[in-house]
Each structure stands twice: as structure tokens, then as C-alpha cells.
Amino acid sequence: MLSPSIPALVKVMVFFLTWTCLWLPIAIIVAIALKWQPPQPLGNKKLPLLASLYLIVPFILWATTWIESVSLADWGLFWQPATLISALLGLGLGIVSLAILFGLQLALGWIQLQSSEVETKTSEKTINPWTSILNPSTLLILLLALWISATEELIFRGCLPNLLQQDYSIVIAAAIASFIFAIAHLIWAPKETVPQLPGLWLMGMVLTLARVTDGGSLGIAIGLHAGWIWGITIVDTAKLIKPSQKVPEGITGIAEKPLAGAAGILLLLTTGTLLFMMQK
């Protein structure tokens, strides 16, 4: 184990510096292959770059467990049926919470359904939102959401908080890890992410509470995170909804991003309250 005299924040910085140094050469090769260069919008080129970043994670985490003399179980990843059940519970909670969020906004007239158009045999076009939801690609998106959420939860709700708790209380450690979690999203779309930073930080805190609620396991947190990623990605890619302009975008979400709006913040607070009430 690294000397206890080494500050936890220094360990965290070394973690991310190592990750960045290993990823940059790969990212440059991927970017050249995709013919992308900053500051061009990433668009559909984000996924290959994200994949290259997260494929390095197992090595970084393995090295960290070896250096710190800990196991994945110490970070909340338990290889047992209870973890799968918790993940399914979290996944359901994430999907249902988003359904309630968008359903209430539709009922209040704050947003409008903007469904895909399906041409009938008589050449008439009808609006059918289910063609966007019940699509084979949604399963792929769900699998990607589970991969992303498992990776991020193991890092930001597992590894980092445990490192930080060597010097700080669990609350302060969670707050710092959630801040890093929020800031890390700036790498992909800085302009869109800035209004979401408070929401992303709060999301990190809620997901930390999910781990506490699950007795230290990351199961609920992974499922909950995946449910949110999956639901929001489906809505975004299929362009299912649009603001009605009846309320300021600060309510529904700046640039149509739920985490950048009061409604999304309320969703996180409500979820956090529910998790607190569920604590084992």
C-alpha cells in the first residue's frame, strides 16, 4: 500500500494523470481514424472515443487494487446474486422515475411529444412514439448504458470515495468524488455540460446514497445510473419530446437537458429521499 502520509487528493490526481497519459495516444489514433479534431462537435464520434477511454479502466483499477492492497469488494462490487437483484431494482427505479418526470411535464403542458412519423399503406403519416422506444437498437443502448454505468460507478462511487476517505469523512469524500464526476463530463461537450454541472454533482451524491442504501454494494447505483442513461439517450436520439415554451427552459432543462433544469433537480432530490427511506 502507498504510504499513508501521501495525501488522498494526491493519490486521486495520480490516478487520473495515469489514466490520461495511457489514453491520450489511443485517443489521438482514434481521432485520426475518425477524421475528427477539436473543436469540432463530436456527434456520433463520441462513442468510439468513449470506448477507448473506458477500455483502459480495468487495467487502471487492477493496478490501484494492487497498490492499495484492496479488492473490488472493498469498492462495492460483489460477485453475488444480490448485486444483480439490486441492479435490476435500480434499473427499474431509474426508468420509472424518468417516465414520471416526462409524464408529469407532458400532463402540465411543459413539453410536447414529438414522435417519429410512420407512413401507412394509404400514404398517410401518423405519429407513433413506440416506433422509437420499441426498437432493436434500444437493447444495444441498454447494454452500453450498463457498461458505462458500471465503469463510472466503480470509479466515482467505489474507488475514489474509498481513497478520499483515508483523509476525509464519507460526506466530504462523496462531495469531492461527485465534483470530479461532474467536471469530467466537460471533456465531451463543454458548452452543453456547464449548465448541467450542479445537476451532475447532485446526481453523484444521489448515486453515493444509493450505495449506502444498498449496504455498501454498487448494485442499486449501477442500475439506477444505467436506467437514467438509457432513458435520456432514447429520448435524445429519437427526439421524442420538445419544450412547449410555456415555461422557461430553466424549468424543463436548458438545451433540453433534464439535469440543467429545475424538474431534473427535483427528480434527483425525490430519488434521494426515496433512497434514504429505503436504507437497510
Regions found by a protein language model. Give the residues of each.
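Membrane-interface helix caps and helix-loop-helix hairpins in membrane proteins
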Residues: 185-193, 215, 219
